[in-house]
Swiss-Prot record:
It comes from Rhizobium meliloti (strain 1021). FliN is one of three proteins (FliG, FliN, FliM) that form the rotor-mounted switch complex (C ring), located at the base of the basal body. This complex interacts with the CheY and CheZ chemotaxis proteins, in addition to contacting components of the motor that determine the direction of flagellar rotation. One of its GO terms (cellular component) is plasma membrane. Belongs to the FliN/MopA/SpaO family. Pfam families: FliMN_C. It is found in: Cell inner membrane; Bacterial flagellum basal body. Signal peptide: none annotated. This is Flagellar motor switch protein FliN. It comes from the Bacteria. The lineage of its organism: Bacteria, Pseudomonadati, Pseudomonadota, Alphaproteobacteria, Hyphomicrobiales. Coiled coil: none annotated. It is a peripheral membrane protein. One of its GO terms (molecular function) is cytoskeletal motor activity. InterPro entries: FliN, FliN-like_C, FliN/MopA/SpaO, FliN_T3SS_HrcQb, SpoA-like_sf.
Protein backbone atom coordinates (compact mmCIF):
# COMPACT_ATOMS: atom_id res chain seq x y z
CA UNK A 1 0.00 0.00 0.00
CA UNK A 2 1.43 3.39 -1.03
CA UNK A 3 1.79 6.10 1.61
CA UNK A 4 -0.62 9.00 1.44
CA UNK A 5 0.76 12.34 0.39
CA UNK A 6 0.04 15.10 2.84
CA UNK A 7 -1.49 18.31 1.59
CA UNK A 8 0.92 21.26 1.57
CA UNK A 9 0.81 23.30 4.74
CA UNK A 10 -0.59 26.79 4.14
CA UNK A 11 1.28 29.69 5.71
CA UNK A 12 -0.55 31.16 8.67
CA UNK A 13 -1.80 34.73 8.56
CA UNK A 14 1.01 35.65 10.96
CA UNK A 15 3.59 35.29 8.21
CA UNK A 16 1.51 37.49 5.91
CA UNK A 17 1.40 40.20 8.59
CA UNK A 18 5.18 39.89 9.06
CA UNK A 19 5.67 40.29 5.32
CA UNK A 20 3.55 43.46 5.33
CA UNK A 21 5.56 44.86 8.25
CA UNK A 22 8.86 44.02 6.53
CA UNK A 23 7.63 45.71 3.34
CA UNK A 24 6.60 48.84 5.27
CA UNK A 25 10.01 48.99 6.97
CA UNK A 26 11.82 48.53 3.64
CA UNK A 27 9.70 51.31 2.10
CA UNK A 28 10.61 53.55 5.04
CA UNK A 29 14.31 52.82 4.57
CA UNK A 30 14.02 53.69 0.87
CA UNK A 31 12.38 57.03 1.66
CA UNK A 32 15.06 57.81 4.25
CA UNK A 33 17.87 57.01 1.79
CA UNK A 34 16.26 59.09 -0.98
CA UNK A 35 15.55 61.96 1.42
CA UNK A 36 19.11 61.93 2.79
CA UNK A 37 20.66 61.96 -0.70
CA UNK A 38 18.59 64.97 -1.79
CA UNK A 39 19.77 67.07 1.14
CA UNK A 40 23.47 66.16 0.81
CA UNK A 41 25.55 69.19 -0.16
CA UNK A 42 22.79 71.75 0.36
CA UNK A 43 24.68 73.29 3.26
CA UNK A 44 27.86 73.76 1.17
CA UNK A 45 26.27 76.53 -0.89
CA UNK A 46 25.59 78.52 2.27
CA UNK A 47 29.30 78.56 3.18
CA UNK A 48 30.02 81.46 0.80
CA UNK A 49 31.37 81.95 -2.70
CA UNK A 50 34.58 80.21 -3.72
CA UNK A 51 35.88 83.17 -5.73
CA UNK A 52 38.29 84.25 -2.99
CA UNK A 53 41.31 81.96 -2.76
CA UNK A 54 41.73 80.06 0.49
CA UNK A 55 44.62 81.39 2.58
CA UNK A 56 45.89 78.35 4.44
CA UNK A 57 49.35 79.88 4.93
CA UNK A 58 48.08 82.45 7.41
CA UNK A 59 47.28 79.62 9.79
CA UNK A 60 50.99 78.79 9.99
CA UNK A 61 52.40 82.29 10.35
CA UNK A 62 54.12 82.60 6.98
CA UNK A 63 53.37 81.68 3.38
CA UNK A 64 56.97 81.30 2.20
CA UNK A 65 57.76 78.24 4.31
CA UNK A 66 60.01 80.16 6.71
CA UNK A 67 57.81 79.12 9.60
CA UNK A 68 58.83 75.50 8.92
CA UNK A 69 62.57 76.04 8.74
CA UNK A 70 63.42 77.61 5.44
CA UNK A 71 62.64 78.00 1.77
CA UNK A 72 61.33 74.70 0.42
CA UNK A 73 61.49 75.80 -3.21
CA UNK A 74 65.26 76.24 -3.01
CA UNK A 75 65.75 72.85 -1.36
CA UNK A 76 63.64 70.92 -3.84
CA UNK A 77 64.71 71.80 -7.35
CA UNK A 78 65.19 75.51 -6.69
CA UNK A 79 63.87 78.22 -8.96
CA UNK A 80 60.37 76.80 -9.12
CA UNK A 81 58.98 80.25 -8.54
CA UNK A 82 60.64 81.50 -11.72
CA UNK A 83 59.08 78.80 -13.89
CA UNK A 84 55.57 79.57 -12.74
CA UNK A 85 55.08 76.22 -10.99
CA UNK A 86 54.69 77.94 -7.64
CA UNK A 87 51.45 79.50 -8.78
CA UNK A 88 49.68 76.46 -7.41
CA UNK A 89 45.95 76.39 -7.44
CA UNK A 90 44.34 79.61 -8.53
CA UNK A 91 40.69 79.65 -7.51
CA UNK A 92 39.94 82.30 -10.12
CA UNK A 93 41.40 80.34 -13.04
CA UNK A 94 38.28 78.35 -13.74
CA UNK A 95 39.82 75.05 -12.58
CA UNK A 96 36.68 74.12 -10.66
CA UNK A 97 34.46 74.88 -13.61
CA UNK A 98 32.74 77.94 -12.24
CA UNK A 99 30.98 79.19 -9.18
CA UNK A 100 29.30 76.61 -6.94
CA UNK A 101 26.75 79.17 -5.78
CA UNK A 102 25.44 79.66 -9.31
CA UNK A 103 24.51 76.00 -9.80
CA UNK A 104 20.91 75.27 -8.82
CA UNK A 105 20.34 72.30 -6.55
CA UNK A 106 18.44 69.74 -8.57
CA UNK A 107 15.63 67.88 -6.84
CA UNK A 108 15.53 70.13 -3.80
CA UNK A 109 12.56 69.27 -1.61
CA UNK A 110 10.67 71.56 0.66
CA UNK A 111 11.87 71.51 4.27
CA UNK A 112 10.03 68.88 6.28
CA UNK A 113 8.51 67.08 3.28
CA UNK A 114 10.61 63.98 4.00
CA UNK A 115 9.37 63.98 7.57
CA UNK A 116 5.72 63.95 6.51
CA UNK A 117 6.36 61.13 4.04
CA UNK A 118 8.12 59.16 6.78
CA UNK A 119 5.29 59.80 9.23
CA UNK A 120 2.75 58.56 6.68
CA UNK A 121 4.68 55.30 6.34
CA UNK A 122 5.01 54.91 10.10
CA UNK A 123 1.33 55.62 10.70
CA UNK A 124 0.40 52.74 8.34
CA UNK A 125 2.32 50.10 10.35
CA UNK A 126 -0.14 47.77 12.12
CA UNK A 127 0.34 47.05 15.83
CA UNK A 128 -1.43 44.71 18.23
CA UNK A 129 -3.22 46.24 21.20
CA UNK A 130 -3.99 43.92 24.12
CA UNK A 131 -6.52 44.43 26.87
CA UNK A 132 -5.44 42.67 30.08
CA UNK A 133 -8.43 41.79 32.22
CA UNK A 134 -6.26 40.35 34.98
CA UNK A 135 -3.54 37.86 35.83
CA UNK A 136 -3.22 34.82 38.04
CA UNK A 137 -0.20 33.11 39.57
CA UNK A 138 -0.27 29.36 40.17
CA UNK A 139 2.08 26.44 40.54
CA UNK A 140 2.79 24.09 37.66
CA UNK A 141 0.92 21.30 39.46
CA UNK A 142 -2.19 23.52 39.66
CA UNK A 143 -1.88 24.37 35.97
CA UNK A 144 -1.58 20.68 35.06
CA UNK A 145 -4.66 19.86 37.16
CA UNK A 146 -6.93 22.29 35.26
CA UNK A 147 -9.87 20.72 33.44
CA UNK A 148 -12.72 22.04 31.36
CA UNK A 149 -15.15 23.99 33.52
CA UNK A 150 -12.47 25.04 36.06
CA UNK A 151 -12.49 28.67 37.22
CA UNK A 152 -9.26 30.65 37.51
CA UNK A 153 -9.32 33.52 40.00
CA UNK A 154 -7.85 36.78 38.68
CA UNK A 155 -6.05 39.48 40.65
CA UNK A 156 -8.67 42.13 39.77
CA UNK A 157 -12.11 42.69 41.17
CA UNK A 158 -15.23 43.37 39.11
CA UNK A 159 -15.36 47.05 38.11
CA UNK A 160 -11.60 47.67 38.41
CA UNK A 161 -9.96 49.17 35.31
CA UNK A 162 -8.25 46.88 32.81
CA UNK A 163 -4.78 47.55 31.37
CA UNK A 164 -4.29 48.51 27.74
CA UNK A 165 -0.95 47.19 26.46
CA UNK A 166 1.13 47.59 23.29
CA UNK A 167 4.24 45.44 22.86
CA UNK A 168 4.09 44.34 26.51
CA UNK A 169 3.97 47.92 27.76
CA UNK A 170 1.04 49.47 29.59
CA UNK A 171 -0.11 52.58 27.71
CA UNK A 172 -3.36 53.20 29.56
CA UNK A 173 -6.29 51.94 31.59
CA UNK A 174 -9.95 51.57 30.78
CA UNK A 175 -13.20 49.92 31.74
CA UNK A 176 -14.94 47.08 29.94
CA UNK A 177 -18.14 48.08 28.19
CA UNK A 178 -20.56 46.63 25.65
CA UNK A 179 -20.41 48.18 22.18
CA UNK A 180 -23.41 50.36 21.36
CA UNK A 181 -23.87 49.12 17.81
CA UNK A 182 -23.23 45.43 18.61
CA UNK A 183 -24.35 44.12 22.02
CA UNK A 184 -22.60 40.80 21.37
CA UNK A 185 -19.12 42.39 21.54
CA UNK A 186 -17.07 44.04 24.27
CA UNK A 187 -15.08 47.26 24.07
CA UNK A 188 -12.90 49.32 26.38
CA UNK A 189 -13.70 52.89 27.40
CA UNK A 190 -10.44 54.79 28.01
CA UNK A 191 -10.06 56.20 31.50
CA UNK A 192 -6.35 57.05 31.53
CA UNK A 193 -3.59 57.32 28.95
CA UNK A 194 -0.04 57.14 30.29
CA UNK A 195 2.58 59.62 29.09
CA UNK A 196 5.73 58.60 27.25
CA UNK A 197 8.05 59.86 29.99
CA UNK A 198 9.22 57.40 32.61
Amino acid sequence: MAPKKAAPIAEPAVFAADAELDQAIDDLRGVLKKDGAADFGADFAAAGPLEQPMDFGSDFGSTDGAGFGGDFAAGFGGGLTETGAAGGFDAGSGFVGGDFDAAPIVGETAPGSGMTANMDLIMDIPIDVQIVLGTSRMQVSGLMALTEGATIALDRKIGEPVEIMVNGRVIGRGEITVLEGDVTRFGVKLLEIKGTKK
